[in-house]
Curated annotation (Swiss-Prot):
Pfam families: Pollen_Ole_e_1. Glycans are attached at residue 310. Residues 56-109, 121-254 are annotated as: Disordered. Residues 60-94, 123-161, 168-224, 231-254 have a biased composition (Pro residues). InterPro entries: Pistil_extensin. GO terms for cellular component: cell periphery. The keyword Transcription does not apply. This is Pistil-specific extensin-like protein. It comes from Nicotiana tabacum. Residues 69-182 are annotated as: 4 X 5 AA repeats of S-P(4). Pistil (stigma and style tissue). The lineage of its organism: Eukaryota, Viridiplantae, Streptophyta, Embryophyta, Tracheophyta. Sequence repeats lie at residues 69-73, 76-80, 83-87, 178-182. PANTHER family: OS01G0164075 PROTEIN, PISTIL-SPECIFIC EXTENSIN-LIKE PROTEIN.
Length: 426
């Protein structure tokens, strides 16, 4: 049972060693400063003797030689890459078929005292068949770290570069890839392995002779710069009056007509007052016109005198009305017992009144039958408008209506006796 546990511990230590080698490679050249597990002194661990299944020679792996530190960068060409370390001889190991790895014949178990600090403290593992747990051995104090000696400085110093001929900067030397770490040995190393001396420094090449110095070439003078005109300040902005946008005219909306309220079902009964008497409006003046006038008869005593002295009204005298317009109109009239005549033209309008005249035609009295030209009895008398009668000051209950037509007057006209007729002076 103890052999199975020790084999498990050995496998765990080998796994930790492989992980440590990969972590050192991932962190650059840190492995150069830390000691390798092969440099630690061996420690003896009492283990029971295990019969080896086969006998064979014992192979010892030499420790890897440390790589030389890279030289400082210089303008000289990069040094040649260091020679790779000699290949290590790896013993032939039979294939692992299961169980634990048996040691080689004639070899001793490796010293695990130096590897114990790299292994975490594992808890007590109880055996498979039962029983108290087997305690692992406590690690011993590690040995002090041994740093490799630094490489000796190169005896030849590079000469300073030529200042006249400037060379382009050399690229930084490429780091050589570190060789992969050797696989973990199966057998323990010898108690005092011999360290190989560091390789000799690479040869330093002498600097190449500087080329012949050429006379410095003079560069042509730069062309004169054109004088820039002084920058004038920008003119002040012109203050334009604000543009007033015309307000949109209100849309001509049709007037909203409120609907008439519907009449109630049973409207209230409102007593009606008696309507006042309707008074017919007065007819307009000028429809139809009426022409009136008087006719007189003058005695022989006042012959040739154009007055109404000693004149009397003449009944039965004939007069005529002649209107000159689009259509000529002639109407006749006879005086009454008061010597007055009235003519009512049928188709006469107010506009045609100024184109009408009245003439004397004949007299019924043979002693007074000569018409005179008094007021145009012979040449025609013009119509003159007459004013309607005035209303009384205290009107009666029923007002007096004005005449229904326009009144026009002519004359008066006079008939006289003939001059051949003897006149009685009595």
């Amino acid at each position: 049972m103890a052999v199975i546990i020790s084999s498990k511990v050995l496998l765990i230590q080998l796994f930790v060693l492989v992980l440590g080698s990969f972590s050192k490679l991932s962190h650059g050249e840190l492995w150069l400063e830390l000691p390798l597990p092969f440099d630690w002194p061996p420690a003896e661990i009492p283990l029971p003797d295990i019969p080896s299944p086969f006998d064979g020679p014992t192979f010892v792996l030499p420790p890897p030689s440390p790589l030389p530190s890279p030289p400082p960068p210089s303008p000289s060409p990069p040094p040649p890459s260091p020679s790779p370390p000699p290949p290590s001889t790896i013993p032939l190991i039979p294939p692992f078929t299961g169980g634990f790895l048996p040691p080689l014949p004639g070899s001793k178990l490796p010293d695990f005292a130096g590897l114990l600090p790299l292994i975490p403290n594992l808890p007590d593992v109880p055996p498979i068949g039962g029983g108290p747990p087997v305690n692992q051995p406590k690690p011993s104090s590690p040995s002090p770290l041994v740093k490799p000696p630094p490489p000796p400085p190169s005896p030849c110093k590079p000469s300073p570069p030529d200042q006249s001929a400037k060379q382009p900067p050399q690229p930084p030397p490429a780091k050589q890839p570190s060789p992969p770490p050797p696989p973990p040995p199966v057998k323990a190393p010898s108690p005092s392995p011999a360290k190989q001396p560091p390789p000799p420094p690479p040869p330093v090449k002498a600097p190449s002779p500087s080329p012949a110095t050429q006379p410095p070439t003079k560069q042509p003078p730069p062309p004169p710069r054109a004088k820039k005109s002084p920058l004038l300040p920008p003119p002040p902005p012109v203050a334009y009056p604000p543009v007033m946008t015309p307000s949109p005219s209100p849309a001509a909306e049709p007037p909203i007509i409120a609907p008439f309220p519907s009449p109630p079902a049973n409207p209230p009964l409102i007593p009606r007052r008696p309507a006042p008497p309707v008074v017919k409006p007065l007819p307009p003046l000028g429809k139809p016109p009426i022409v009136s006038g008087l006719v007189y008869c003058k005695s022989c005593n006042s012959y040739g005198v154009p007055t109404l002295l000693n004149a009397s009204l003449l009944q039965g005298a004939v007069v005529k009305l002649i209107c000159y317009g689009k259509k000529t109109m002639v109407q006749w009239a006879t005086t009454d017992n008061k010597g007055e005549f009235r003519i009512m033209p049928k188709s006469l309008t107010t506009a045609d009144v100024g184109k009408c005249k009245v003439y004397l035609v004949k007299s019924p009295n043979p002693n007074c039958n000569v018409p005179t030209n008094f007021n145009g009895g012979k040449s025609g008398g013009l119509l003159k408008p007459l004013l309607p009668p005035k209303q009384p000051i205290t009107p009666a209950v029923v007002p007096v209506q004005p005449p229904m037509s326009d009144l026009y007057g002519v004359g008066p006209f006079i008939f006289e006796a003939s001059s051949k007729m003897p006149c009685d002076k009595n």
